[in-house]
């Protein structure tokens, strides 16, 4: 029995490379949809590279696309994303690209065209404007930042 919350929202997508798959969620409950590499590349240890995915999307205003690493490749190979998560704004219409980095200290990572390289999550966001004030309201935490709540 399905309810409206289980039905995914639709996002317009433009396939820029007809040979590549569209993003896909492997399981119905998966938050992220796999993105595929539009090119074959080798990433040397400690290096980064911008890789296209062969798609462009039109996100609704009030949503954002967040690009996350794939956990298996991060664990097994050290493949990650430099600006995790990558941000796709609702008004961006260009090709989605992923800034990949090889965090392994010794082994190059080979990515073949059509391989899964990242996950795209689409989330609702609160759109805000900013209002300058002289002072901020007091809180229990105050200005205490990094490490201020302890290590355990």
From Swiss-Prot:
One of its GO terms (biological process) is dUTP catabolic process. Keywords: Hydrolase, Magnesium, Metal-binding, Nucleotide metabolism. GO terms for molecular function: dUTP diphosphatase activity; magnesium ion binding. The gene is dut. Its EC number is 3.6.1.23. It catalyses: dUTP + H2O = dUMP + diphosphate + H(+). Gene3D superfamilies: 2.70.40.10. This enzyme is involved in nucleotide metabolism: it produces dUMP, the immediate precursor of thymidine nucleotides and it decreases the intracellular concentration of dUTP so that uracil cannot be incorporated into DNA. InterPro entries: dUTPase, dUTPase-like, dUTPase-like_sf, dUTPase_trimeric. Pathway: Pyrimidine metabolism; dUMP biosynthesis; dUMP from dCTP (dUTP route): step 2/2. Belongs to the dUTPase family. It comes from Corynebacterium diphtheriae (strain ATCC 700971 / NCTC 13129 / Biotype gravis). This is Deoxyuridine 5'-triphosphate nucleotidohydrolase. Substrate binds at residues 70-72, 83, 87-89, 97. It holds the Pfam family dUTPase. Its cofactor is Mg(2+).
């Amino acid at each position: 029995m399905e309810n409206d919350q289980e039905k995914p929202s639709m996002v317009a997508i433009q396939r820029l490379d007809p040979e590549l798959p569209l993003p896909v969620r492997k399981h119905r409950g998966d938050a992220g949809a796999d993105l595929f590499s539009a090119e074959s590349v080798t990433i040397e240890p400690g290096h980064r590279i911008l890789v296209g995915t062969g798609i462009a999307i039109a996100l609704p205003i009030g949503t954002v696309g967040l690009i996350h690493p794939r956990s298996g490749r991060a664990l097994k190979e050290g493949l990650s994303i430099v600006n995790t998560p990558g941000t796709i704004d609702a008004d961006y219409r260009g090709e989605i690209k992923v800034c990949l980095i090889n965090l392994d200290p010794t082994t190059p990572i080979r990515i073949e065209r059509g391989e899964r390289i990242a996950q795209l999550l689409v989330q609702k966001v609160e759109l805000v404007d900013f209002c300058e004030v002289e002072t901020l309201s007091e809180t229990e935490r105050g200005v205490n930042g990094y490490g201020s709540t302890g290590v355990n």
